[in-house]
Amino acid sequence: MKICCCLITLLLVPSCSKVSPDQSRGTSFSIKRGTNIAHWLSQSTRRGEERAAFFTQKDITFIDSVGFDHIRLPIDEVQMWDENGNRNADAFQLLGQALTWCSDAGLRVVLDLHILRSHYFNADEKPLWTKPGEQDKFIQLWKDLSAAVREWPASMLAYEIMNEPVADDPEQWNQLLARATDSIRTWEPERVIVIGSNRFQSASTFDQLRVPENDKNILLSFHFYEPFHLTHYQASWTRLRDFAGEVNYPGQIVVNGTTPDEQRVYNIDSLEKMMEKPIRVAKRLGLPLYCGEFGVIMKAPLEDKLAWYGDMVAIFEKNGIAYANWNYKAGSFGIVDASLNPDVAMVDTLTPE
């Protein structure tokens, strides 16, 4: 493992200095490589002391020491607010604590509103798109969240409006995105806002994203989990739960595959080609690009997994794309276990010198 402070400037002037809430806000948000703090304030039933103990300052110290420069921090509505929109004091205290730790370590934060009561990307019913009142509530959540954390400078903290929107029509997301962005701009004109396209922030749908005009404080984001046979190898929540074949990367993804999907060949060139849409949009608009999620399940074959991660990082570095792997600790995709024992090969691959 190693320490690396090299940054790709995502907006205006880069800064490696530590920041604190009372510093004047800038419009720079400089990141290169980070990790997702999943299953803490999002997608978790942990509460009380168990939740508080899951992610601590020791984690931030480790993240900084191995060369990451930021975290992406998913939060869920159900953890942060009750059904009437009242804040959960414990959850907001943990959030504030994490921001302080990151500031003290010189780390940046992408604060991601991950799951709403009205929108979970894998759910069949998503009232966010069918009930206007839910969209009003969504805007109110951002107003309250902004009020809670806006003291942190724009050079240290960015807002990701919503994780992996899934609407029947991409215009439903584009319209809500425009409304949310306009609202946030009335409170925080210089805050960096992270946005992605409809249908899971997929690279393949990026040309359907309507990006706010004349706003340079935008960070474009996509997620990448291809080839699925490798990244979600035998994942219990997917169609591959009972898959018994042998996966292979680079090359034909399933050894002795019998379907076109299983016989498809993946390598660094094919992966980069799949990212063409977001790369092209970012270049055309002169905006920075971020892969906010990518990863391979822990149970996948190690050699293939490391080869994939190595190729992904090479593509990101070639194209000036910042990135955050999914995810940091435990779960199905972690790069460290619950006792902070790292997968050294994985960490080194994600943080090359």
Question: Model segments located where?
Answer:
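Hydrophobic beta-strand scaffold residues
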Residues: 109-111, 289, 323
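Active-site mouth of glycoside hydrolases
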Residues: 25-192, 197-207, 217, 332, ...
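C-terminal motif of bacterial Sec signal peptides marking the signal peptidase cleavage site
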Residues: 14-15
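Active-site region of glycoside hydrolase catalytic domains
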Residues: 132-265, 272-297, 318-321
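Sec-dependent signal peptide recognition
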Residues: 1-7
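Aromatic-rich peripheral "rim/lid" segments of glycoside hydrolase catalytic domains that contact
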Residues: 300-353
